[in-house]
């Protein structure tokens, strides 16, 4: 009989864990410095991800040893003190990596199996963002932290195939990758006594040269692969249209980009793989993107990456092993995830004893069973994955149709391949929900790691998130438990008490409600939906619920989840208990400096203007003086600045009674406020 989930870290003593956390922290900081600052990485992305995830897991398991300066609290950046800093106009996100066809196709089937996708070369170079205004290259900026980058414009201007002036006076922001061809790299490296390791490192270092004349001597090139046109009234419907526009604007794009249906992606990947070794430029994989822009908008983003794209990485490291057992775990959402326990193997310097099997469809497709000899690949996860079956076991493993934790009949949700336990009282679901709530990125309750929460649940101290706030009533009893001395109990209770001061913008996503993560929470707050009372009011009104679709980044799936979440009596009871416990149920106001005339106002800007070209300059001015930017007119919008071509936004504003200003009225307003806008734009 398969066993329940076991914690692979339980064999570590606290002393061993403390030492390992310190060692991993130092090692990761060293590699972050080499990668982001020196552009001289010494280990692969695989190995770095493994170290990072290992440290994250240990810190969650032993939170008492987490360091306030832990590298897991800091996002890596290539910012350099020698360059001016530039605030990106849009978040510069990364992509989620996949390492095999099965994983990618699982995402395709979940996203849009019949849709059209682009398949592009993933260039192995240095990421750059180009900003053009009225057809002129204004800024070239490194990705940096994703929000702020280094302005390396002078160096970027020296790259031969970057157009400095476009054939149209258009404003456009582009993502691109700076690289060198193998031929150019070999020739340049020969002249430099062979001191450069590879084209990628040389490209990254070249755009960070302090003297642009040195950059000009290096044979750099660029491919652009995505763009935003902020002022175009006619929006693009597909990524293919954007690609065509880039080519018309004389931007170089990755060659041989294919646009294929979801059913043809696997075949297309094989065709690309046949070409990769004969390419003249460095690539480390492919990028697969959903073609339909409206579908992208509906899917939206996480805080780190778009949901509508994936990176497909080449050449995962693989080794053979034997499956000893197959276990399965129940997550907080009820999802049941099987994993193979394998004979220990060494992959990229780490000992691997478990490998994920994803779901029953994946198991069936590969024909995985206990006793099988399989190939295991190192991936971007802490637990690698079974990729191939070399020698089958006696029979293909079947996940039991009942939850391993509570014995409830499992179900399949619409359009998903995973099995789920539907029982909200399932012990493993509840425990993992509490663990999620307490994690560092959520409510960050010190002293409560996985082990402590499992103990408290199993010994009837807590049975829900709300029970944490009654734990103080059992302090004396808890201190008598093994491993819970007075000091550790005081740390736990202090952490619980301090969590009451966490902003509502942390509380709401920490509840683990479907589709209500940090990104959606921020979108709601930005649009004035900043309290639980406001949310519950909307949940009772169908028209108000539908109006949420006006918020960019919120799609139909989020709306459906919103309705389901806030009509669930269990969730409503939890919210009520947390209210009574004293947690914050309204977002803290953003502090605005004195003399901010637009403070408390929400402005939308549309149309064209004589004094504000591009029109973003008007919005930047409003934000500078305390206003809030909104991209669509809704009942929460207080003002609309409308120029010629305003269209439907002006009609909507008039319907809702929003204050409308034309350009002359806006200039008069600025004059009355004694704002000299010409010195600011």
UniProtKB/Swiss-Prot annotation:
PROSITE patterns: BRCT. The active site is at residue 122. One of its GO terms (cellular component) is cytosol. Its cofactor is Mg(2+); Mn(2+). It comes from the Bacteria. InterPro entries: BRCT_dom (IPR001357), BRCT_dom_sf (IPR036420), DNA_ligase (IPR001679), DNAligase_adenylation (IPR013839), DNAligase_N (IPR013840), NA-bd_OB-fold (IPR012340), NAD_DNA_ligase_OB (IPR004150), RuvA_2-like (IPR010994). Residues 593-681 form the BRCT domain. One of its GO terms (molecular function) is DNA ligase (NAD+) activity. It catalyses: NAD(+) + (deoxyribonucleotide)n-3'-hydroxyl + 5'-phospho-(deoxyribonucleotide)m = (deoxyribonucleotide)n+m + AMP + beta-nicotinamide D-nucleotide. GO terms for biological process: DNA repair; DNA replication. PANTHER family: CHROMOSOME TRANSMISSION FIDELITY FACTOR 18, DNA LIGASE. Belongs to the NAD-dependent DNA ligase family. LigA subfamily. This is DNA ligase.
